[in-house]
From Swiss-Prot:
UDP-N-acetyl-alpha-D-glucosamine binds at R102, R131, P132, V133, D134, L135, D316, I338. It comes from Rhodopseudomonas palustris (strain BisB18). It is found in: Cytoplasm. Keywords: Cell cycle, Cell division, Cell shape, Cell wall biogenesis/degradation, Cytoplasm, Peptidoglycan synthesis, Pyruvate, Transferase. This is UDP-N-acetylglucosamine 1-carboxyvinyltransferase. The gene is murA. The lineage of its organism: Bacteria, Pseudomonadati, Pseudomonadota, Alphaproteobacteria, Hyphomicrobiales.
């Protein structure tokens, strides 16, 4: 099993190109099931989760062709996928495929909308709390589908097609919003999604669906209106840059010190996180090529942060911020409100010498002068990269094990960091 070896202490200086957003690329690929024409997606990141979803879609009969780089593309330019779901041969998504990635459960929406039936295994993926699919099922039932759970599968049918409806989520749900959005696009009549998630990735998917002939308004607000259409056509769409990758590398620079240009980043996608970094002592400069992050020799300031749905501080940057605050001058407080059981990285950060106390959903981090390298084990995607950030600043050698979590969400992380001066390498075997 691959590991990552880091020798800490080097500042980061240079340019890091930001990849396409995983959290947009996955639902965009799934949206390809909604049409029998070809959907072309540019700037798709090369990630394990993307490859896994290609296998899942292939199981349904979807033909996916990955095109090479075009003239003028950057070395790290994401891949272009041509997705053709002209002939859907199977409406069942089996356990052995879905169990490896939770987002793959979302195929239930386009299969139900277009084929009027679906049988999808209950999902897998990162072990963060329970993440129930109840809200997704509720949304599809509102649209007129009949759903039952049998033998670990959700069996859905809508023989007469889906019908527009009012869907009011009791709490903000990104997954539920994606599923409702895709399903309602081909439903008869008007659908209104209340308390919808406002994340940029939702907006990106809605933009793509509109290019395909959908009639969606209000994406990015808590109220989305969808006028159902009979058919969607092919389109070409570029995946937006990854705000979580942007924030992760910005925090790495704040941790080590240095000067790094995050090429292609869009600051409006993560303003709350950039504000926190500024408060912590980093300097953020917006320019035509993205975001420049610098930190001189001054120490890090402690911060108090509560995770929240967009535009609040992202839960997917919580672990990285905790690693950063492990070296702040004073006590920081981080409260997690989105997912339960999302502090599994605490015990691993403690192996570096971090001082962290948990009280319910709040972590108190008492900064230390220096972290020490250690062998550590990744527990989930975002926790794994927090260990990399800690290792970049720690004295001595750090070995991060179980890095398959990293490969699910970060494209060529060790290469991007190494190009900026970090001593980091992947060890195979």
């Amino acid at each position: 099993m691959d590991r990552i070896r880091i020798v800490g202490g080097a500042q980061l200086n240079g340019t890091i190109p930001i990849s396409g957003a995983k959290n947009a690329a996955l639902p965009l690929m799934i949206a390809g099931l909604l049409t029998d024409e070809t959907l072309i997606l540019d700037n798709v990141p090369r990630l394990a989760d993307v490859a896994q979803l290609q296998r899942i879609l292939g199981n349904h009969g979807v033909d996916i062709m990955a095109a090479g780089k075009r003239p003028g593309d950057h070395e790290y330019q994401g891949q272009t996928l041509h997705i053709s779901a002209k002939n859907i041969i199977d409406t069942t998504a089996p356990y052995e495929l879905v169990s490896k990635m939770r987002a793959s459960f979302w195929v239930i929406a386009p299969l139900l909308a277009r084929m009027h039936e679906a049988k999808v295994s209950l999902p897998g993926g990162c072990a963060i709390g329970t993440r129930p699919v109840d809200l997704l099922i509720m949304a599809l039932e509102k649209l007129g589908a009949t759903l039952t759970i049998d033998g670990g599968y959700v069996i859905a049918s809508a023989p007469g097609g889906l019908k527009g409806a009012a869907i009011e989520f009791p709490k903000v749900t990104v997954s539920g919003t994606h599923v409702a959005l895709m399903a309602a696009t081909l439903a008869r009549g008007t659908t209104v999604i209340g308390n919808a998630a406002c994340e940029p990735e939702i907006v990106d998917v809605a933009d793509c669906l509109n290019k395909m002939g959908g009639k969606i308004s209000g994406a990015g607000t808590p109220r989305i209106t969808i006028e159902g259409v009979a058919k969607l056509h092919g389109a070409r769409h570029t995946v937006l840059p990854d705000r979580i990758e942007t924030g992760t590398y910005a925090m790495a620079v704040a941790m080590t010190g240095g000067d790094v240009q995050l090429s292609g980043a869009r600051p409006e996608l993560l303003q709350s996180a950039l504000d926190v970094l500024t408060q912590a002592g980093a300097t953020i400069t917006v320019n035509n090529d993205g975001i420049r992050v610098t930190r001189n020799g001054a120490g890090l300031n402690p911060v108090t942060v509560t995770t929240a749905p967009f535009p609040g501080f992202p839960t997917d940057l919580q672990a990285q911020l905790m690693a950063l605050m492990a070296c702040a001058k004073g006590a920081s407080h981080i409260t997690e409100t989105i997912f339960e059981n999302r502090f599994m990285h605490v015990q691993e950060l403690a192996r570096f010498g971090a001082r962290i106390q948990l009280d319910g959903e709040t972590a108190t981090i008492d900064g230390v002068a220096k972290l020490r390298g250690a062998p550590v084990m990744a527990t989930d995607l975002r926790a794994s990269v927090s260990l990399v950030i800690a290792g970049l600043a720690a004295e001595g050698e750090t070995m991060v094990n179980r890095i398959y979590h990293l490969d699910r969400g970060f494209e060529r992380l060790e290469e991007k960091l190494s190009a900026c001066g970090a001593t980091i390498e992947r060890i195979s075997g």
